[in-house]
Amino acid sequence: MILHANLVDLHQRQIYSVALEVQEQKIQRIQKIASDANLPFLLPGFIDAHVHVESSMLVPSEFARLAVVHGTVATISDPHEIANVCGMQGVEYMIDNGKQVPFHFFFG
């Protein structure tokens, strides 16, 4: 499948119109094309570097469902609140629940 987009290069601080070759949900090749401001923009997902998922009053899988629509693809999560209330059993629940979705939770 070939997709066309404006690729936001955060390192070079540039935007390039590109043709992306995608196979099995992975980008195989990127080729620059003539500039086209009407194409959708493609940029890396965001990582929330400090969050207490349990403060949202949501289980990790539901938190992920809502966060991903805003561009967040991962969190570095501090589970101290659930740990204070439920101990290791609560932390293990959060980890296990987070594994049910294609979102990356890093608990520490």
Model-derived features with residue positions:
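A generic structural signal for short, solvent-exposed coil/turn residues
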Residues: 12-14, 41, 99
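Alpha-helix N-cap/helix-start motif
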Residues: 15, 56, 84-87
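N-terminal metal-binding scaffold of metallo-dependent hydrolase/deaminase domains
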Residues: 1-34
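Surface-exposed beta-strand edges and their flanking turn/coil or helix-capping segments
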Residues: 16-18, 61-62, 89-90
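Divalent-metal coordination cores built from histidine and acidic residues
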Residues: 65-108
